[in-house]
Design a protein with these regions (language model features):
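Residue-level detector of Asp-centered blade-edge/turn motifs that repeat once per structural unit
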Residues: 77-79, 126-127, 170-171, 214-215
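C-terminal/domain-edge helix-coil "capping" segments
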Residues: 40-111
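A flexible loop/linker signature enriched in serine peptidases of the S9 family
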Residues: 76, 88-98, 114-117, 134-143, ...
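Short, solvent-exposed, polar/charged sequence segments at loop or secondary-structure edges
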Residues: 1-30
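Short loop/turn segments that connect beta-strands within beta-propeller blades
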Residues: 40, 103-107, 147-151, 191-195, ...
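Hydrophobic beta-strand positions that form the internal "hydrophobic ladder"
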Residues: 83, 131-132, 172-176, 219-220
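A short beta-strand motif characteristic of beta-propeller blades
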Residues: 108-113, 152-157, 196-201, 242
Length: 242
């Protein structure tokens, strides 16, 4: 209990916060009571309860970590999120590529796509139900969209040249991507509902790696238009680049 905590000893050790808790198991059901304590002020920050089955114990642990992290930093925790990544294994002069998702610590791996052709640049939808990525299965890079629940997938681009670096907007309505169909790598957006491409840059330099601002109204991207690779900001409404 909190009364049993010797805050002075923890201060000497340089600890800033403590997390204490207790676990009650009843059949297949867990009830976890946990508290966050601030050492310097000997203050209770919060006490909360998390409940779930044995199968949910990993998710409960991640949820508790998220709560503690956000209370300390003011930033939403990422412990309950997942990562998408590509692995490659070479055997008998052939390379097998796998698009995978897993918990952030690598647990609960799940195969999404397996191919003898390179897979690149997976990007999550905001609701974490879909991925977009680049696959070379058509003989050139193309952007695909895939539903994680039913494995349905759709090819979104089929242009000559580079089709790459897809990035899903936070509002879920558009993709930012790089196309070189007109000769030079440029930044485009793709309206997922209207299936319409809009070109946003027109420069002799290489523009690539677009990423969205949280409000979905602007992009940051990498360009060597200044002589070396630098990060630029593009306002979508007026096309201004800074």
């Amino acid at each position: 209990t909190i009364k049993d905590i010797y805050f002075r000893d923890w201060k000497i050790l340089g600890a800033e916060y403590l997390v204490i808790g207790s676990l009650i198991l009843s059949g297949d059901f867990y009830e976890i009571t946990y508290s966050l304590l601030e050492v310097h002020s000997s203050r209770l920050v919060f006490t909360k309860i998390a409940k779930g089955s044995k199968r949910q114990l990993r998710d409960l642990s991640h949820h508790i970590s998220d709560e503690v992290y956000e209370a300390i930093t003011g930033i939403e925790g990422a412990f309950s999120t997942k990562v998408a990544y590509v692995t490659s294994l070479k055997s008998n002069n052939k390379t097998l590529y796998k698009l995978m998702i897993s918990d952030v610590d690598g647990a609960r791996e799940r195969l999404i796509l397996e191919s003898n052709h390179p897979i690149m640049s997976p990007s999550w939808s905001p609701d974490a139900k879909e991925l977009v990525y680049v696959s070379f299965e058509t003989g050139r890079p193309a952007v695909f969209r895939q539903n994680l629940a039913n494995a349905n997938r759709k090819q979104l681009t089929n242009f000559r040249g580079l089709n790459g670096a897809p990035s899903w907007s936070p509002d879920g309505k558009k993709l930012a991507l790089v196309l070189s169909k007109d000769g030079n790598p440029e930044i485009y957006t793709f309206d997922l509902r209207k299936e319409k491409f809009i070109r946003h840059t027109n420069h002799f330099a290489i523009d690539t790696e677009p990423n969205w601002a949280p409000d979905s109204k602007s992009l940051v991207f990498t360009s060597d238009r200044g002589g070396s690779p630098q990060i630029y900001r593009l306002t979508l409404k007026n096309g201004e680049v800074q």
